[in-house]
């Protein structure tokens, strides 16, 4: 699968099965929330389910630990100062860390990365992270402001 260009070799790709765009929503599917924002393809985004987002956050937490057997640092590539990218980042040089697909190609991945950051770094509970991510992403342009969230202290 050659989906992430030069990132494929030195990376682990995580793809959520999600209609992403409202026009692909199946009848009676589990997806319920649609956000608007210029960062989304066509300006509208079907939010993954809470279960999908929780599983993604748990996987990222594990992948960035020594237990995984990998050397992936918990570095949020799209985070600069207190702003997290929701779309392309300037000069996306290949480097270790956690990337959203949209940082270098396509238009997906930013919302799950935002949710995971809120869970793993801000320490929010699942439902609070979900509602906060939706509120931050709704109408956002290129970035969301995370300055009001203190990063949890390492133990």
Residue ranges and their predicted role:
Residues 1-2, 22:
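A short local loop/turn or secondary-structure capping micro-motif enriched for an aromatic residue
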Residues 3-9, 90-94:
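Extracellular/periplasmic catalytic domains that process cell-envelope and extracellular macromolecules
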Residues 10-23:
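Glycine-rich, acidic and aromatic/proline-enriched surface loops and short helix-turn segments
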Residues 20-155:
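Basic/polar, cationic surfaces and motifs that engage anionic cell-wall
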């Amino acid at each position: 699968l050659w989906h992430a260009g030069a990132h494929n070799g030195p990376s682990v790709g995580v793809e959520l099965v999600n209609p992403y765009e409202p026009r692909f929503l199946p009848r009676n599917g589990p997806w319920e929330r649609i956000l608007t924002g210029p960062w989304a393809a066509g300006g509208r985004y079907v939010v993954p389910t809470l279960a999908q987002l929780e599983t993604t956050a748990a996987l990222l937490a594990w992948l960035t630990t020594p237990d995984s057997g990998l050397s992936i640092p918990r570095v949020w590539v799209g985070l600069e100062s207190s702003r997290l990218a929701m779309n392309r980042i300037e000069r996306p040089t290949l480097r270790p860390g956690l990337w959203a697909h949209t940082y270098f190609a396509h238009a997906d991945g930013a919302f799950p990365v935002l949710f995971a950051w809120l869970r793993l770094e801000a320490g929010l509970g699942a439902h609070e992270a979900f509602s906060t991510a939706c509120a931050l992403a709704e109408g956002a342009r290129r970035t969301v402001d995370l300055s009001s969230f203190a990063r949890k202290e390492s133990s």
